[in-house]
Amino acid sequence: MRFHVAGTQTAGVKKSAALVGFAGEIISVRAHLDTAPTGAAFVIDVNKNGTTLFTTQANRPTIAIAGTESTSTLPDVVSVAAGDRLSIDVDVIGSSVAGSDLYVTVSIKRATVQ
């Protein structure tokens, strides 16, 4: 699933959201900014039906100061069902330059039908 939040970033909840189309397991979460943050790292959160997937908050996708890519991150909660709503929160922005044009990819492996 792909999410996009256009423009200069501000902290806030439900910046972008989408419905999951099938049952499965999240295998990675990645984030990208077209303009790098400066002064502070950029941190996002991904929620399923309003609750964070990253119960260990230190594991949230983070883009380093002056960077544009997060590393691939595996959330603590990986199971999703058809109809679940995934949403993106922007928790921390750069303190000098916020960062702009956020892209987030949540990769989901479809559950095997038995």
Language model regions located:
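Short secondary-structure boundary micro-motifs
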Residues: 1-3, 28-30, 56-63, 91
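Beta-sheet-rich sandwich/jelly-roll-like modules and their strand-loop junctions
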Residues: 1-43, 95-114
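Solvent-exposed, low-complexity segments and loops of surface/extracellular structural proteins
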Residues: 10, 52, 84-86
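Surface-exposed loop/turn positions
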Residues: 24, 81-84
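Terminal beta-strand-rich extracellular "head" domains
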Residues: 35-82
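Short beta-strand-plus-loop segments that form exposed binding edges in beta-rich domains
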Residues: 88-96
